[in-house]
Structure formats: structure tokens, C-alpha cells
Amino acid sequence: MNEIATPQEFSDICPFSDAQFKEKMKELVAEDGFKHAVTWVMPDIDFDGFCKMLLQINTKKEFQENVMFDFLKLLAAKTTEGISYDNIEKVDQNKSYTMMTNHRDIVLDASFLNLALLYNHYRTTEVAIGSNLLIYKWIEDLVRINKSVIVKRDLNIRQALGAAEQLSGYIHFAITQKHESVWIAQRQGRAKDSSDTTQESLIKMLAIKGGKSTIDNLLELNIIRQ
């Protein structure tokens, strides 16, 4: 299935397209920082062989199914006593959703959600991740190869308003046009003291775009709050 082209207005925050995939992967494997990270996490890996395998991959879907799936299973085995979930059968595979959760680890929470989806042969979600975590260009490239959406942080008020409008527009586009689900944390920062409330500014951001009433703009995003 061919990807729907993403409008240029979202080009600096959206996941890389499959048309960009091989070029971006070639740039990534040449980065010293990427080599250091991979060999630190997997010290026994044949890095040159690993890179050769990566360069044979053509799409984000192939990358997630052939590389990230095994990595996430290994990560879950090393960091948890097991992952459990229920009611996944209630998620309609023919619909796209905005999945909102609290989070204690912005990487692991979304990763384990996508691991559950992969186990059940569902499409993975795109993952909204703050730009403050992307301290090197190669890290930003890696997460965008892996279906991440950039949430711009550390902006002045005027810039923040523009970024919120851009992000809202992209999420609406992803859900209604690309038919991709999106995961986003329900509040900025880690959940603390059993606080499980959704940040009001997040709801306002999601409702900016859609061209309808606030309620209808939210309804078209098919929000699942976990």
C-alpha cells in the first residue's frame, strides 16, 4: 500500500516517509553516536553485519517488524517480569486512534504498547515525543525512522501556540487521512503521586484543528485513554 504524502507544513515533525527511509537509514548507520549506542546496548553484536541488514530494509513497517519487534521483546525480558494487557480485541483494526496514557518512561511506555500491538498483528502507533529528549540529530532521525512525531518543547509563548496548531493539524491528518494511530502522553512530564488526570492544555491542543466544533474535532480523533 502506497503512503499518503504528508503536507509540507508538517515536514519537520512527522515520521520520515518510506520514500525517505533508505536515505535516512544510510545517514544513521554512518553516525558514530549510533554505533556507540548500539554497541553499548548490545556489546556482542556484529555492528557491520547489523548495519548491512539495516540497509536492506525498505520501509518503516519492515524496520519495526524485523528489528524493533525483537529488540522490544528483549527489552521487556530484561526490564520486566512480564507484560500483560487485556481488551485489545476491542480495538478495531480498521480504525485509527489517538491513544493517551499517563507515563513514567516516555520511551518504554509507548514501546510496550506497540509491542502488544505487534504481538497481536495490529499496526503500531506513531509516537509523540518531546524535542527536549532528542539531544543529537541522529537520535531525532532514529525516532522519526521509527514512526515518531516530534513535539516541540522549550518555546516562547508565540512559538508554542504555533507549535500546538501544527501538532494538532498533524494528528488530525494522521488519524483521518493517513489512517495511522498516534500515541501521546496525557500530560507533560512523568506521572507522580498517583496523578492520573489529563492535562487541559493537551485537550485544547487536540481540538484546535479539524474545522468543526470543539467536541466534533475531538470525536474525529477516536481518543482512547488508557
Functional labels for PLM-detected ranges:
Residues 1-97, 103-114, 140, 145-147:
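Membrane-anchoring hydrophobic helices of lipid-metabolizing enzymes
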Residues 78-226:
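Soluble catalytic domains of membrane acyltransferases
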